[in-house]
Amino acid sequence: MKNLLICIIKMYRKYISPLKRPSCRFYPTCSQYSLEAIEKYGALKGTLISIKRILKCHPFNEGGYDPVK
């Protein structure tokens, strides 16, 4: 499952992300953060952490440096 999620994120980064303008308010980007979270915590917990981060990525949040802890 972990490898499937990583593959999906990498496909998103290669094929979908270039079609959109850069909009992530954080560093590392949300997709990189998701990869790191899934690698560190596994499929389930990493996905939940990633969803929480993606929900924070909006114009009303200041953003900034937010590494996987």
UniProtKB/Swiss-Prot annotation:
Record keywords, A-Z: Cell membrane, Membrane
Major place of residence: membrane
Membrane topology: Peripheral membrane protein
Subcellular localization(s) per the UniProt record: Cell membrane
Keyword Repeat among UniProt keywords: no
Residue ranges that the Swiss-Prot or TrEMBL entry lists as coiled coil: none
UniProt KW Transport keyword: no
Gene Ontology cellular-component annotations: plasma membrane
Assigned protein family: Belongs to the UPF0161 family.
Primary role: Could be involved in insertion of integral membrane proteins into the membrane.
Name by which UniProt lists this protein: Putative membrane protein insertion efficiency factor
Organism, as annotated: Clostridium botulinum (strain Langeland / NCTC 10281 / Type F)
